[in-house]
Amino acid sequence: PYNGIDGKLYVLLTVTAENTEWSAKATDAEGNALDWATATASTGEGYINLSFTRNTQKQPRSGILVVTPTAEGLNELRIPITQTAAPDHLTTLDGDLDLTTLGLDHGYSTLMPYAPDDTMIPVSTWDINILTDGVTPSMGGIEGSGHRLHFMPVTERIEMNDDDMYILPDGEYEIVTPKPHPEDPDAIYYKDAWTIDKGTEGTTTWNKYVDFWYLEYRDNEVVGAAPVVSGTVTVTKMEGFENSYVFEFDLLDDIGNRLTGT
């Protein structure tokens, strides 16, 4: 299978027919059209384009690809098709997500370490939240309704500039599995620059969404969520603006849904 730009999976099947026209369809055992698979026949070119939506359920599903010749005396060809169950996952998305359509347009960040005299850690970690209107941070977490992206890029150690500001460097940041802590308890733990730890599930209610997550809120409650497990974030500082950036996202959640946009 290959991934299409519409988020579907595609398989091309070659058909060699002699002295007959033919058609194709994807059905269940009772002959009803499937809602998750579609067969498109290109009889002149001799192939079937079988497209699937991604299975987000924990059960496999099956159907039949029916190829029907028009010539008399020829039987239809019935090919079983099966789609495996989705792997164990945390995402609630059932397809790709275009982040550009959500209205993410402002945010806030904190920097660690932020004390100029804290020189033990050779990298800087930026705790970034990008939000839509209607979502606001509070002492208890997030209030309102809307969308949020939370992620923590790591850079080489950043010092305050002449304008008393810290500037996030331009470049591409890769989503990675968190580094293990050193066995030596006296060793200093720090992450690699130009990385962002992937999203994982925390062990407490107040810290359930750790590191890189897309979250949807309704009336202060999370109603949709997706951990980002791979991909890249490209950062570009906006010229002429004191503290504004463009973020380009090319991400995957834990069942392969794409989260993309700028």
Where are these regions (language model features)?
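Short, exposed coil/turn segments at beta-strand boundaries within extracellular/luminal domains
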Residues: 69-78, 257-259
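Surface-exposed binding patches on compact interaction domains or structured appendages
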Residues: 10-49
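Surface-exposed helix/loop patches within compact recognition domains
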Residues: 112-235
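Short, surface-exposed loop/turn segments at beta-strand-coil junctions that are enriched for proline
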Residues: 53-59
